[in-house]
Every structure is written in structure tokens, then in C-alpha cells.
Amino acid sequence: MSRVGKMPVKIPEKVKVSVDGNVVKVEGPKGKMHFPTNPLVSVQVDKGEVKVARQDESHVAKGLHGLTRTLVKNALEGVVKGYEKGLEINGVGFKAEVKGKEIHFTLGFSHPVVFKLPEGVTAEVDAKQTKLTIRSVDKHLLGLTAAKVRDLRPPEPYKGKGIKYADETIRRKEGKTGAA
């Protein structure tokens, strides 16, 4: 039995969970989300708890058991608290600006870079326009969006210019030494 998968997940107040075939739907104060589950795993809702069970003892089903339980837990946490990820923009003249569902970046290219936010993701920039905070109820979508934003201009190791996660440390390199 999966140690993670066998533990039931308590449903918080003001949250509705429903299972429709292989789709789990979660609604809460911050929003709603749904995700598919594998047919090898079944999800049941009873007495304020969500329980995950696997259909057989195959290697794949054992792996999906714990995964599905964690996805349910993340969905419940997301619709109650929400998730956020911070990004920092380093470099002379590098900045970001949120306009509706788009983020406009000035990243040292000859043109501005426009990034369209996916549905269910919001962003805000601080007053200096160098700290970007991305928020969503879907942890997976939030991580994907943050990674795509970082890929617009990843930090380089010599000066550290670029977009990095707020909690990320960049391994710096020394420049060339003088010619001998």
C-alpha cells in the first residue's frame, strides 16, 4: 500500500468536491479546477474526506496511487489558499509591466517581449517593476507559467542578468583573467 496514497484527504470548509467518471472537480472560495485521473485509480468522496484507491497491484497503479492523492490535496489547498511564485528581474533597464492578461517585458532585446497569461493565472509587479508575483489555484499551471516566463531571459552566470525565481541562487562564474 502506498504510504501517501492510503491517507485520506480532509475536505476543508466551503469546498465542494465531486467525481464525475475519471474527472475530479474541486470548487472553493479562490476558484475552481478539475483534473483527470487514470482509470487504474478510483477516487471516492465520503464524510468530508477524499479517499484514493487503486484497482490492481501493478507497478504503474502503485505509482499513480500516491500521485493522485497528492494532486487532490494540491487542488484542495489551491482553491482555499491559492499558490504564488515570485520572480526577480535583474539587469540594467530590465523591467516588467502587467497590462490586462499580458505581461510586457523589456529584457535588453531590440523589441519588447509580450507574454500572454494562461486562463486562471494572474500576475502583479512591484513599484520598481523588477519583482513579479504570479498567482493561481492550480499548482501545476503556476509552475509551468513561471518556468516559461523565466525562459524568456534565463539568468546568465557572469553578471546574473535575466529572470530568476525569487528563491533561486545563481552560481556565478569568474570572468577571464588577463592575457599572459
Swiss-Prot record:
It comes from the Bacteria. Gene3D superfamilies: Ribosomal protein L6, alpha-beta domain. The keyword Endoplasmic reticulum does not apply. Keywords: Ribonucleoprotein, Ribosomal protein, RNA-binding, rRNA-binding. GO terms for molecular function: rRNA binding; structural constituent of ribosome. Transmembrane segments: none annotated. One of its GO terms (biological process) is cytoplasmic translation. GO terms for cellular component: cytosolic large ribosomal subunit. It holds the Pfam family Ribosomal_L6. This protein binds to the 23S rRNA, and is important in its secondary structure. It is located near the subunit interface in the base of the L7/L12 stalk, and near the tRNA binding site of the peptidyltransferase center. Part of the 50S ribosomal subunit. Belongs to the universal ribosomal protein uL6 family. This is Large ribosomal subunit protein uL6. The gene is rplF.
